[in-house]
């Protein structure tokens, strides 16, 4: 993936590292039939109160409707373009099926214009872009866009550069064991679909935004340190000068422990499917 380090013509771009999209993307115009408008809420609820901090502003962007289900079975599709999607870190591909229907999918690494891909509930070629039930994929294969429940659509392994590896079947034969990019090992029901390959834009983690204005363009507002606030605004606030937080552990603005606390629900049914937690 081409990475470009911007020349230091000003302080704002001195350390900037960006993806050279011109060498990767094939078009800058999305398919109109697969684009819808989004209304911004700036982190507010229906009462106008802030429920998510640090959201607001940013450039206008339209949502691309992505086919996460890959449920057009046994219909060959041809890749027409590799495009940028402002709503996710990976690239997307426009594919056209035999009957003329157009859909967007998450673009895997090494997928090229003109490639023909297929979704099936039977055994097909294990090649990049093909989607099939996870039980039919051989051990050692890297996959993405994995369903957690059959027919619900891919919910895991969708961000740039991510992938999961098939490790084999469990002792009952009802589940397939996969290793996620986080290191977690878990069971996936055999009927769940997965797509072959690694998600595109694998160098996304090397990007350096360079200046605060880039985050403002993305709709991310500044984060104020709790220690810089007053004591009625934050548990870390108050004191003379640079005072310590005054607690046995860092706290959230609402007084809860902030670091090293597990947030997963202990009663979640899917806990039984996790063989080894992430590292």
Swiss-Prot record:
Basic residues bias (residue ranges): 254-279
GO molecular function, one term: rRNA binding
Disulphide connectivity of cysteines: none
SUPFAM superfamilies: Nucleic acid-binding proteins (SSF50249), Translation proteins SH3-like domain (SSF50104)
UniProt-annotated stretches for the region Disordered: 217-279
Domain of life where this protein originates: Bacteria
Pfam family, any one: Ribosomal_L2_C
Presence of keyword Ribonucleoprotein: yes
Coiled-coil portions: none
Signal peptide: none
GO biological process, alphabetically ordered: cytoplasmic translation
Keyword vocabulary terms for this entry: Ribonucleoprotein, Ribosomal protein, RNA-binding, rRNA-binding
GO CC list: large ribosomal subunit
Described purpose of this protein according to its UniProt entry: One of the primary rRNA binding proteins. Required for association of the 30S and 50S subunits to form the 70S ribosome, for tRNA binding and peptide bond formation. It has been suggested to have peptidyltransferase activity; this is somewhat controversial. Makes several contacts with the 16S rRNA in the 70S ribosome.
Assembly mode: Part of the 50S ribosomal subunit. Forms a bridge to the 30S subunit in the 70S ribosome.
Family: Belongs to the universal ribosomal protein uL2 family.
NCBIfam families reported in the protein's UniProt record: rplB_bact
The protein, known as: Large ribosomal subunit protein uL2
Gene this protein is translated from: rplB
């Amino acid at each position: 993936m081409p990475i470009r380090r911007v020349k230091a013509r000003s302080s704002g771009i001195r350390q900037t590292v960006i993806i050279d999209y011109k060498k990767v993307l094939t078009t800058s115009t999305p398919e109109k039939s697969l684009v819808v408008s989004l209304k911004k809420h700036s982190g507010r609820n229906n009462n106008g109160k802030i429920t998510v901090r640090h959201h607001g502003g940013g450039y206008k962007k339209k949502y691309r409707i992505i086919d996460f289900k890959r449920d057009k079975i046994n219909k060959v599709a041809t890749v027409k373009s590799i495009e940028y999607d402002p709503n996710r870190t990976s690239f997307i591909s426009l594919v056209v099926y035999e009957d003329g229907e157009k859909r967007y999918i998450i673009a895997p690494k090494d997928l090229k214009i003109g490639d023909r891909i297929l979704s099936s509930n039977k055994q097909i070629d294990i090649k990049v872009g093909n989607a099939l039930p996870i039980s039919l994929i051989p051990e050692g294969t890297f996959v993405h866009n994995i369903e957690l429940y059959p027919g619900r659509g891919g919910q895991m392994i969708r961000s740039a550069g991510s992938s999961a590896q098939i490790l084999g079947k469990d002792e009952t034969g009802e589940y397939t064991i996969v290793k996620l990019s986080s290191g977690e090992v878990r069971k996936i029901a055999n009927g769940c679909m997965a797509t072959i390959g690694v998600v595109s834009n694998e160098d996304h983690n090397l990007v350096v935004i360079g200046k605060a204005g880039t985050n403002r363009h993305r709709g991310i507002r500044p984060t104020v340190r709790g220690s810089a606030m007053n004591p009625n605004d934050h548990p870390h606030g108050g004191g003379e000068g640079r005072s310590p937080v005054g607690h046995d552990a860092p706290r959230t603005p609402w007084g809860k422990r902030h670091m090293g606390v597990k947030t997963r629900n202990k009663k979640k049914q899917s806990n039984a499917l996790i063989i080894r937690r992430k590292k």
